[in-house]
Amino acid sequence: MAAPFDIVFALFPRITQLDFTGPYEVLTRLPGARCVLASVEGGELEVDSVMRFSGLRRLDSVDECDLLCVPGGFGTVAAVEDQAYLAALRRLGAKARYITSVCTGSLLLAAAGLLKGKRAACHWAWRDKLADFGVAQDPARVVRDGIIFTGGGVTAGIDMALEVMAEIGGRDLAETVQLAIEYAPAPPFDSGRPELAREPVLRAARARLDSVRAERDAAFARAVAALDAA
């Protein structure tokens, strides 16, 4: 029987559900995996769609974990100033064997002080903010820096989780899981990265961020100041 391997998904309101359900689908297949969904308040959580998740534990009830996973989403704007959430990331990250993130989750790791001087991936429309926290932005889909694995936007979380699985359980296990979930991306359009997308598509995608850009930038500036003052 495999030894227990504890995985904590540190959630917050208005996450993008695929940011954590993608890696969750992969990582639950690790031998001995025991996955916990947790948030500051625990209980029920609403994501950035109509979906809700219930039965979450409170983050302060989780003592430690082998792997910490931090998703992203528009809720990052509020979470980056949630000191209880950031404190939980610092506490769990200090003992974790692996620290991971998906999408804008790397910005939350950065705000918690866990990425200082590191390289990290992030959603393409947000990754420039990593530099504000002293983190080197990397456009790769998955970036590893020591025990830290960061994924780019949303779907990159599956790639990140498979790389982590290969590190922990070996390539054969990772490839077997990839086949089991039939992860063989073949999108109908070649527009999944900003450098590949047509200009009208890129403009439309950037426009989605406009509604929160000012709020985001102000929140991140305060988060940087708080981290510098710590």
Regions found by a protein language model. Give the residues of each.
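Extended, subdomain-level signal for the structured scaffold at the beginning of enzyme domains
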Residues: 1-99, 107-111, 127-129, 137, ...
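Structural detector of well-ordered beta-strand residues that form the stable sheet scaffold
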Residues: 99-100, 121, 138, 149
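Short pre-catalytic strand/loop immediately N-terminal to key active-site residues, enriched for Gly-Thr
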Residues: 94-95, 143-149
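Generic recognition of short, well-ordered alpha-helical interface segments
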Residues: 121, 125, 156-159, 172
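Active-site-proximal catalytic alpha-helix in oxidoreductases
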Residues: 106, 149-162
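A conserved active-site-flanking secondary-structure segment within enzyme catalytic domains
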Residues: 115-144
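Solvent-exposed alpha-helices and their adjacent loops that cap or buttress functional pockets
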Residues: 61-62, 141-142, 157
